């Protein structure tokens, strides 16, 4: 039908506020300020929160499948889907093997100086959110913006860190092809790291794990510990989180 879709050509805060008062329902996808404005508008609203999906790579998993799935997910639409992996937590006894698999799959590991430069591009320290000009940028665009050089065939840039604090850019949501990487001594520590990252940066959103699919005890421990609406096992989180092809148990939606 005519006029079923319309938009504001030159958006402003005043026009957005006016629009929110004139509609029957608001579906608010955006920053915290915009979601808060929607909830305060007097119009029924559904707000979408940030995702800070951490993925545990357990020593019982198929490493090649796990790494390939994460890269497949993280590179779709340059990582813009909010259910996409933001960092991985790897058990110590397989850490080097997993790292090598990422490297062999054309992921680039940043040193500290490079990581700091990239962080200035994507991370807004005041809001702990993503800078708007970094959304959905390709690896090469991000590298150019940061003033660093990476191989032209790089799929994802990765930074190894042990800092899970909310002030660490790499511990937060990154809606572009960037990953943080953590090492855990054992499964218990992996649960601690994953739970902290998910809760502080994306409570109620998504968490994932790659493991032996028959290990129900481990899967149950993970599911009960994570404060997330979507618990994904052996699944690329971008696709598993939005439902359909990789997860028919969830109704398809790009608004999470």
Predicted regions: what they are:
Residues 22, 41-42, 226-227:
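Short, structured coil segments at secondary-structure junctions
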Residues 9-14, 33-34, 214-216, 238-240:
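Short acidic loop-to-helix transition motifs that present clustered carboxylates
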Residues 1-3, 217:
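A glycine-rich phosphate/pyrophosphate-binding beta-strand-loop-alpha-helix module
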Residues 35-165:
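ALDH superfamily catalytic-core signature
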Residues 5-23:
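A structured beta-alpha segment of the ubiquitous adenosine-cofactor-binding alpha/beta core
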Residues 3-9, 27-30, 45-48, 110-112, ...:
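General beta-strand structural signal in soluble alpha/beta enzymes
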Residues 148-256:
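Conserved C-terminal structural/oligomerization subdomain of aldehyde/semialdehyde dehydrogenase
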